Amino acid sequence: MSRACELTGKSVQYGNNVSHANNRTRRRFLPNLCNVTLISETLGQSYRLRISANALRSVEHRGGLDAFLVKSDDKELSQRARLLKRQIAKKQAEAAA
């Protein structure tokens, strides 16, 4: 399981710990990943995703998983999230027609 958010693509970053004496040692900055279950209102199902706390706030802000995925860019999404986005778009197109 990779340490990357499935919705925003946030992953591990690298940098330095810097002491008061300006000594530098390499370190990793890990994303704050949470295992959450989000409900798709369009599909009527719940999906278990591993997303960052920041992504969870963004999903809530945009009004749910469906709205977040419709507005998000495909290159940031994981393969599973892209599949989910296509399913939602297809279902919404059927409902509109």
Swiss-Prot record:
GO cellular component, one term: cytosolic large ribosomal subunit
One Gene Ontology molecular-function label: structural constituent of ribosome
GO biological process, one term: translation
Keywords: Ribonucleoprotein, Ribosomal protein
UniProt-listed Gene3D superfamilies: Ribosomal protein L28/L24
Alphabetical list of Pfam families matching this protein: Ribosomal_L28 (PF00830)
Family: Belongs to the bacterial ribosomal protein bL28 family.
HAMAP family per UniProt: Ribosomal_bL28
Protein name: Large ribosomal subunit protein bL28
Native source species: Brucella canis (strain ATCC 23365 / NCTC 10854 / RM-666)
Lineage: Bacteria, Pseudomonadati, Pseudomonadota, Alphaproteobacteria, Hyphomicrobiales
